[in-house]
């Protein structure tokens, strides 16, 4: 029983005496490791961010081209006001001259043929 207690006390004293020495070294090592981690993150960020910005620019460019050429931008649907000189109604629709007299009916609208 006494040898167990003595062994425990010896191991305990060795652990306590070596503990503070490790604590003095660990903060410096931890600072170095965190600095290395930050350097790796900055390096990765410098590689990824320009590629993401380039990809975003390409997507925005494609989106703007698509919206310019979309049918809704080029054509006008049924019941929508149109210009008599430049009728851009959908296929199957025409832009006839207004038939009813009145203030509200003086503009041209796209109607079915």
Curated annotation (Swiss-Prot):
Disulfide bonds, which pairs?
A: 82-95, 89-110
The GO terms this record gives for MF are: ion channel regulator activity; toxin activity
Q: In which tissues is it expressed?
A: Expressed by the venom gland.
Which cellular compartments is it found in?
Answer: Secreted
On whether Disulfide bond is a keyword of this UniProt record, the answer is yes
- Location, primary (coarse class): secreted
Record's keyword annotation contains Secreted: yes
Signal peptide boundaries: 1-21
What Gene Ontology cellular component terms go with this record?
A: extracellular region
Q: What is known of its domains?
A: The presence of a 'disulfide through disulfide knot' structurally defines this protein as a knottin.
Q: What is this protein called?
A: U11-theraphotoxin-Hhn1l
The scientific name of the source species is: Cyriopagopus hainanus (Chinese bird spider)
